[in-house]
């Protein structure tokens, strides 16, 4: 039976740890120049409604590393953009390829596609979640701290899709998530509810200083997501005081790790001094998209579960 990765909640704690372990092994093999064609003869469809740098490159290069082939499809250039149903598209693509990723505006598009696809489907970003990003983040944190359990991660800024996935990942990882966000920009209540009902530790503050207190890592993201350009000025005003600068970083634990899933709007949500500092894990985090996603692809496309 096929397994999809639409939400971070699709993984058990054991599966979560297994993917991180495999990702670390694949990373070592890549650095050592050891071939690992675990997906030889496999083709991945990459369906994009939203533009991307890291997502497209990491999946494309990842499939090449694994001996497979990645087929890029801009949704507007397919029959999806001309009115063909998601269900019919999923049925047809399932006859051509061995797996699919989707980067889309609406989470419902991915769940609908997965419902009718007979191949594994991976959420490469939706308005509700970004689970692949959180796996890369978890690999980065594990490399830095050794274990995830007991870490305090402070999220500063908009309670967006990445924040939702991070909150729900507290269940599998044992990480404590502290969110500092202005009122009206809180994460999805359903994500918070899920975490708290399943043993996760999550606290929401409207004060960034309280959120970062004793944090092992501080995570931020752009305040203005794609499609929100019309409310940019409003959000810039609302997020005054939530910039990750040196003063806020100094309120966290000593040598706290700085995370940002990129692209960064320097001078808005984060300063040059912080993102380029010795405490920045941002570039390792970006690289780890490649390794974490390769592990996800292997596990799903070889029926590893």
UniProtKB/Swiss-Prot annotation:
For this protein, the Enzyme Commission number is: 2.1.3.3
The record's listing under PROSITE patterns reads:
CARBAMOYLTRANSFERASE (PS00097)
GO MF annotations in UniProt: amino acid binding; ornithine carbamoyltransferase activity
> Which reaction(s) does its UniProt entry say it catalyses?
carbamoyl phosphate + L-ornithine = L-citrulline + phosphate + H(+)
Pathway the protein takes part in: Amino-acid biosynthesis; L-arginine biosynthesis; L-arginine from L-ornithine and carbamoyl phosphate: step 1/3
Q: Which family does it belong to?
A: Belongs to the aspartate/ornithine carbamoyltransferase superfamily. OTCase family.
Q: Which protein is depicted?
A: Ornithine carbamoyltransferase
- This chain is encoded by the gene named argF
């Amino acid at each position: 039976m096929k397994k999809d990765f639409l939400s971070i909640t699709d993984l058990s704690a054991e599966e979560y740890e297994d993917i991180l372990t495999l990702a670390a092994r694949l990373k070592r093999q890549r650095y050592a120049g050891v071939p690992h064609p675990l997906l030889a003869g496999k083709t991945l469809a990459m369906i994009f409604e939203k533009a991307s740098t890291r997502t497209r490159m990491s999946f494309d290069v990842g499939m090449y590393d694994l001996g497979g082939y990645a087929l890029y499809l801009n949704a507007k250039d397919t029959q999806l953009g001309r009115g063909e149903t998601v269900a019919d598209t999923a049925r047809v693509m399932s006859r051509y390829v061995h797996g699919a990723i989707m980067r889309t505006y609406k989470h419902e598009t991915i769940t609908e596609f997965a419902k009718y696809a007979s191949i594994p489907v991976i959420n490469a970003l939706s308005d509700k979640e970004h689970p692949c990003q959180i796996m890369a983040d978890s690999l980065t944190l594990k490399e830095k701290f050794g274990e995830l359990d007991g870490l305090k991660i402070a999220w500063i800024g908009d309670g967006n899709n990445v924040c939702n996935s991070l909150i729900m990942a507290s269940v599998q990882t044992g990480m404590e998530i502290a969110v500092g966000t202005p009122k009206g920009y809180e994460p999805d209540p359903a994500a918070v509810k899920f975490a708290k009902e399943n043993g996760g530790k999550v606290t929401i503050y409207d004060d960034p200083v309280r959120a970062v207190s004793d944090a092992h890592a501080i995570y931020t993201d752009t305040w203005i997501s794609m499609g929100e350009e019309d409310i940019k000025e409003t959000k810039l005003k609302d997020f005054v005081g939530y910039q990750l600068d040196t003063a806020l970083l100094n309120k966290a634990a000593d040598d706290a790790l700085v995370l940002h899933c990129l692209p960064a709007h320097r001078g808005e949500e984060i300063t040059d001094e912080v993102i380029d500092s010795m405490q920045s894990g941002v570039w390792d985090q970006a690289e780890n998209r490649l390794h974490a996603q390769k592990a996800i692809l292997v596990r799903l496309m070889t029926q590893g579960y």
